[in-house]
A protein has these predicted regions:
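Amphipathic alpha-helical segments at domain termini/boundaries
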Residues: 1-62, 182, 198-233
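Short glycine-/small-residue-rich flexible loop motifs, especially phosphate/cofactor-binding loops
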Residues: 26-27, 77, 113, 178, ...
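Long, structured ligand/cofactor-binding scaffold of large enzymes
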Residues: 35, 40-166
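Conserved catalytic cores of soluble enzyme domains
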Residues: 127-233
Length: 236
């Protein structure tokens, strides 16, 4: 019995997943002055040291019995090395539904936190998502809505007393993403590209009746003064 066909099929599926949210969304990410999550991980880690976990987690599309497309989960994680030291790294994929919760595989993000604690390895979060709440798309998929929660938050908090935790806000970050940036020992933003807030300008305007720009609400200058991040003026 040969496994050659199965191995080739697995490789094909990995290639589909590596396409992230598709060429159009990748191009949009680049035009916004931002790298994709895979490009970020590739530049961060030592060459060829990244060992990905859960690459095929996501939503599959079939034509009969043949897989024709994969929408991967919008979170990429694994282990790698920085200057020879082993670390755990996890990053949001903004090219898949803007990092929204309806395209996530919840256990995948939580696993990155758990494995870092279990292996006693530094944890690096590359945050570029819209949070952990629901959306209209969530309602379309599940037929219901829900009150956002994070049952794994105890793991996030526990990590602060056990391992080094670093976070980088690499785009507009709201909700749970903002909490993940704040709950770290060292955090950084990209000036003019990153904003960190609990809720974005449309929600704030609806609540207070006053329009506000995202830089004024949660830009790097605001967050450095408020103590939300340690370094908010990095340039790319």
């Amino acid at each position: 019995m040969s496994w050659e066909d199965d191995v080739e099929e697995l490789k094909r599926r990995m290639e589909l997943a590596a396409g992230m949210g598709g060429a159009e969304n990748v191009e949009r990410q680049h035009k916004a002055g931002r790298l994709t999550v895979r490009e970020r991980i590739d530049r961060l880690l030592d060459h060829s040291s990244f060992h990905e976990t859960g690459a095929l987690a996501g939503a599959a599309q079939y034509d009969g019995e043949r897989l024709v497309a994969i929408r991967p989960a919008n979170f990429v994680m694994g282990t790698g090395r920085i200057d020879g030291r082993r670390v755990v790294v996890g990053g949001d994929d903004f090219t898949v539904r803007g990092g929204a919760n309806d395209a996530s595989i919840g256990g995948k993000q939580g696993y990155s936190e758990r494995i870092a604690r279990e292996l006693r390895l530094p944890l690096i979060r590359l945050v570029d998502g819209t949070g952990g709440g629901g959306s209209v798309k969530t309602y379309e998929i599940t037929g219901r809505t829900y009150v956002p929660g994070n049952p794994a938050w105890d793991i996030v908090v526990a990590a602060m007393s056990e391992i080094p935790v670093v976070a980088a806000a690499l785009g507009p970050v709201a909700g749970l993403g903002a909490a993940r940036v704040a709950c770290s020992h060292f955090s950084v933003m990209v000036r003019g590209i990153s904003q960190v807030f609990v809720a974005g300008p449309p929600v704030v305007e609806r609540a207070f009746g006053t329009p506000i720009e995202k830089e004024a609400l949660g830009g790097s200058d605001i967050q450095v003064r408020a103590g939300g991040v340690e370094i908010g003026r990095a340039h790319v």
